[in-house]
C-alpha cells in the first residue's frame, strides 16, 4: 500500500500585483550549512513544536469553515510559504506573519527563523531510499517588473527558490507555465493550481510538496472488502476497507479523550498517526488538539498486537481559500492596503489578495512486494486471550511525520472516504 500526497498553495496579490504560493519548502546555501554544523538556536525539534502549534490552530479554523468535510493540508508547506513571503515584508506586516506562525519574536530572531526553515527543508529534501519527500519553490516574475535583487537572493540562498520570467500580460500562457511546473513537481497530482490570473500580476511564488511512501507492513489487496463507513448522521456509505490481522504496532487508548491512537510505520523515516475518536467524540478530540496532546499520544504509544485492523482505501482532494483563516490567526495586514511588502519591489504598492491551497491525498494498495513477512504479523496464540479490533469505520484523523525531524508535512481529517 502506498501513501501519496501532494499539495499546492497559491497566494495572489493585487494592486499592481499578485503573489501566489502553493505548499512547499525550500533549501539553503553553504553558509547556512556551516551554521547547521555548528548548531542553531532554532533546532528542528523546536521548529517542529512551533509548526505543530500553527498546524492545530489552522486545522481548527478549517474545521469551523468546513464542518463534517474532509480536511487535507500541509502546515509545513503553508508556514514555509509564509516564511518566504516574510522575506519581503517589513514592520507590522512582518511581525504579523511571523507571530501568526506562532514564533515568539522576543525569543527567536528573524534570521534564526529562516535558518531553522533552511536546515529543516534541506534535511527533508535529502535523497531517501524508501520515502520520497520532494519540496521546493519557484518565483514567476513579470518580465517588465523589477524585483529587488536582495529579495531574490535571500529566497534563493535561504530557500533555494528557482526564478522564472513570465508575461502576465498573456494570462493564459502564464497560467500554463505555472501549472505545468507544479504538475511536474507534484508528479501530476496537482493539475491546476492557478485557475485564473490578473494582468496586473507582478509575481507568483509557488511552493509545492510531494510525498510518497510504502507501509512497512503492507495490506494485502485480496483482503480488501466492501464495508460501511458512518459519515455523520447520514446513511452509512459503502467504501473499500483494507484489512490486516495480527499486526504488532504502536498503540494507545486515550480514555480521557475517548479515542484510539495507532501508529503505522513506513519503510523509511516516516510514520502515520491515526486517531480514531469514539462515536460522537470527534469535536472533543479536535478541541483538545495542541502540542501537549500530541506529545502525550506519542509518549504513550506502546507496541500492541492488533488482531484485526480495518482502514478505508481512499483518494480525496481539497481546495481552500485561506485569507479569512489566516486573518483569524492574526495575519491581516498583508491583505490590506496597509501591507508593507516593500522589500520585494521597493515600494508599498503590493498586497496579497488571495491565498488558495490545494491538496490531494491518496491511500491505496500497490500490490508490490514490500516487506510483508518480517515476523511482526505472527504472534503466539496466547496473545489472543484479549483480542483487539480497530475499525476505522467512522471519521478519523491522520498525521504524517518525518521521524528524523518530528515535523508533520501533512494533516488530514477523513470525514467521508468515498
UniProtKB/Swiss-Prot annotation:
Upper lineage: Eukaryota, Metazoa, Chordata, Craniata, Vertebrata
Protein name, entry field: Serine protease inhibitor A3N
GO biological process, one term: response to cytokine
Region annotation RCL: where it falls in the sequence: 367-392
Broad class of where this protein is predominantly found: secreted
Tissue expression: Expressed at high levels in brain, heart, liver, lung, spleen, testis and thymus, and at low levels in bone marrow, kidney and skeletal muscle.
Coiled coil: none
Keywords: Acute phase, Glycoprotein, Protease inhibitor, Secreted, Serine protease inhibitor, Signal
Subcellular location: Secreted
Signal peptide: 1-20
PROSITE patterns recorded: SERPIN
Further remark: The single human alpha1-antichymotrypsin gene (SERPINA3) is represented by a cluster of 14 individual murine paralogs.
Family to which this protein belongs: Belongs to the serpin family.
One MF annotation (Gene Ontology) recorded for this entry: serine-type endopeptidase inhibitor activity
Amino acid at each position: 500500500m502506498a501513501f501519496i500526497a501532494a499539495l499546492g498553495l497559491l497566494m495572489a496579490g493585487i494592486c499592481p500585483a499578485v503573489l501566489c504560493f502553493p505548499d512547499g519548502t525550500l533549501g539553503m546555501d553553504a553558509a547556512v550549512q556551516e551554521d547547521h554544523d555548528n548548531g542553531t538556536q532554532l533546532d528542528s525539534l523546536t521548529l517542529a513544536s512551533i509548526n505543530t502549534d500553527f498546524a492545530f490552530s489552522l486545522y481548527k479554523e478549517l474545521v469551523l469553515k468546513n464542518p463534517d468535510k474532509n480536511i487535507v493540508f500541509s502546515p509545513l508547506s503553508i508556514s514555509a510559504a509564509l516564511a518566504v513571503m516574510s522575506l519581503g515584508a517589513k514592520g507590522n506586516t512582518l511581525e504579523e506573519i511571523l507571530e501568526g506562525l506562532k514564533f515568539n519574536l522576543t525569543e527567536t530572531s528573524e534570521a534564526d527563523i529562516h535558518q531553522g526553515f533552511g536546515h529543516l527543508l534541506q534535511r527533508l529534501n535529502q535523497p531517501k531510499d524508501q520515502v520520497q519527500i520532494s519540496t521546493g519553490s519557484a518565483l514567476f516574475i513579470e518580465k517588465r517588473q523589477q524585483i529587488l535583487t536582495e529579495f531574490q537572493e535571500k529566497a534563493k540562498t535561504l530557500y533555494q527558490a528557482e526564478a522564472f520570467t513570465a508575461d502576465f500580460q498573456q494570462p493564459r500562457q502564464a497560467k500554463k507555465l505555472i501549472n505545468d511546473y507544479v504538475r511536474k513537481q507534484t508528479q501530476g497530482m496537482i493539475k491546476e493550481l492557478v485557475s485564473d490570473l490578473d494582468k496586473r500580476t507582478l509575481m507568483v511564488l509557488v511552493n509545492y510538496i510531494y510525498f510518497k511512501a510504502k507501509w512497512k507492513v503492507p495490506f494485502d489487496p485480496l483482503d480488501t472488502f466492501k464495508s460501511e463507513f458512518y459519515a455523520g448522521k447520514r446513511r452509512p456509505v459503502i467504501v473499500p476497507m483494507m484489512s490486516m490481522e495480527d499486526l504488532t504496532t504502536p498503540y494507545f487508548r486515550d480514555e480521557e479523550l475517548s479515542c484510539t491512537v495507532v501508529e503505522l510505520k513506513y519503510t523509511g523515516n516516516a510514520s502515520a498517526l491515526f486517531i480514531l475518536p469514539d462515536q460522537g467524540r470527534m469535536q472533543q478530540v479536535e478541541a483538545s488538539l495542541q502540542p501537549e496532546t500530541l506529545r502525550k499520544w506519542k509518549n504513550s504509544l506502546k507496541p500492541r498486537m492488533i488482531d484485526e485492523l480495518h482502514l478505508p482505501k481512499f483518494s480525496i482532494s481539497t481546495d481552500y481559500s485561506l485569507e479569512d483563516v489566516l486573518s483569524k490567526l492574526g495575519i491581516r495586514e498583508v491583505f490590506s492596503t496597509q501591507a508593507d511588502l516593500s522589500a520585494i519591489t521597493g515600494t508599498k504598492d503590493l498586497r496579497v489578495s488571495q491565498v488558495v491551497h490545494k491538496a490531494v491525498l491518496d491511500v491505496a494498495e500497490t500490490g508490490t512486494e514490500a516487506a510483508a513477512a518480517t515476523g511482526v504479523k505472527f504472534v503466539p496464540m496466547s496473545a489472543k486471550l484479549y483480542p483487539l479490533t480497530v475499525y476505522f469505520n467512522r471519521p478519523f484523523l491522520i498525521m504524517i511525520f518525518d521521524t528524523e525531524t518530528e515535523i508533520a508535512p501533512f494533516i488530514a481529517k477523513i470525514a467521508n472516504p468515498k
